[in-house]
């Protein structure tokens, strides 16, 4: 379950930003998670709750905005939607796809005190 280590990394960022921006409590964390990022959302919610116990983010709400996967097809030159890595191009059937979106994991914004 790599989601736990992802949550630990998020907490580290929160702690660094709290020192830098002088806030003491995190109320909400909004993440953007790409459909191709390989993140299990239920595990992410669980891991976030566990990792944040007894920290500045204890009880914080995690909101996840999922971004669709996108790729550029080298076969037909089209930008296409993909749900999984290594899918074929839905337009021409080629497997020569270059992912151009939907593989990100980033903190979009925070609500803090």
Curated annotation (Swiss-Prot):
Pfam family, one: HypA
KW Zinc (keyword) present: yes
Alphabetically ordered keywords of this record: Metal-binding, Nickel, Zinc
Gene Ontology MF term list: nickel cation binding; zinc ion binding
Binding residues annotated for Ni(2+), in chain numbering: 2
InterPro entries with a match to the protein in the record: HypA/HybF
Signal peptide positions (record): none
Entry-linked Gene3D superfamilies: 3.30.2320.80
Residues annotated as binding Zn(2+): 73, 76, 89, 92
Record has Zinc as a keyword: yes
GO process terms (BP): protein maturation; protein modification process
Family of this protein: Belongs to the HypA/HybF family.
PANTHER family: HYDROGENASE MATURATION FACTOR HYPA
Function: Involved in the maturation of [NiFe] hydrogenases. Required for nickel insertion into the metal center of the hydrogenase.
Protein name: Hydrogenase maturation factor HypA
Provenance organism: Alkalilimnicola ehrlichii (strain ATCC BAA-1101 / DSM 17681 / MLHE-1)
């Amino acid at each position: 379950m790599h989601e736990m280590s992802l949550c630990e990394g998020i907490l580290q960022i929160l702690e660094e930003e709290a020192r830098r921006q002088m806030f003491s409590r995190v109320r909400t964390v909004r993440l953007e998670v790409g459909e191709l990022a390989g993140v299990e959302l239920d595990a992410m919610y669980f891991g976030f709750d566990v990792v944040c116990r007894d920290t500045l983010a204890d009880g914080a709400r995690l909101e996840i905005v999922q971004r669709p996967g996108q790729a550029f097809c080298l076969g037909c030159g089209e930008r296409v939607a993909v749900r999984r890595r290594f899918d074929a191009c839905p337009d021409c059937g080629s497997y020569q796809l270059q992912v151009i979106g939907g593989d990100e994991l980033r903190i979009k914004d925070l609500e803090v005190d």
